[in-house]
């Protein structure tokens, strides 16, 4: 039971953001010259954070009316929970600022800025650091997951956030989302082909060209490619719903138990790939599986409901994870996460409103490294 959000009510849209590498004003060779004097690396999510970024972005234009208030309450709950461990900055539309302030309370720093939706994992910058400690924010030209949703305002979020924290903005020649990238902080990434090597994002761009760009921007030495699955959900199969690094050398992978699900076969194929893989240091990966719930609370159940425990978020000293009302798998997930993250507090939240829209806690958060 790991379904994720499908195409939203508007259907296909015409993009106003950049799709092709040539449209960004850079070629791959030009970008190499532009960044050759500074080496960037994306820290792993478990490294110390300066802050977490979120977006109070649920709107009636995108979300069903009965879900909207629940999603807003869920976002506030996640933000307040994380704020007990580290600062939280939340983008909010001007017209929603009073509601957000009331729900989030003073522990969350609200910043008024135009946004379309809440998925800041995909719209926000992917933060990187240099060897000297300089902070950069990579903009991957968000295009509404391949022009499936209106995104004119969200296309600006990565640059706005980067400028706000006074970091260097790095515009990639690729179009992709943060949810498609999972790194261990030591040179290894797991990335889904179905998302990144997709003509709705990077037409005509080869895997080798993608690797060249991602290795340079994120400090990668090796990319483990998972096939993913395109066309089944709005993201075309993001990595953060399939596999996550817990530490260098250790990966937790989602395992779909429902044979009728489109994820049943692909999660098993992913397990085979991960178990056979080595990381950038030559280590064979240790792979731990997280079984999804067999049942969920029915109040907001739908075909889009994202019932996957793997979409947890690491903040300073804690793991913020979902729970779905299946006592057995909720309990087992807590135990597995506690074993994997022995030095962190495991907090499970009911985020059924967010899940009903096909996403999770990780999709709604973006870490800023310290």
Predicted regions and their residues:
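The feature marks the mature, well-folded catalytic cores of soluble enzymes
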Residues: 35-370
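Boundary at the C-terminal end of the N-terminal hydrophobic targeting segment
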Residues: 29-34
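N-terminal export signals
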Residues: 6-28
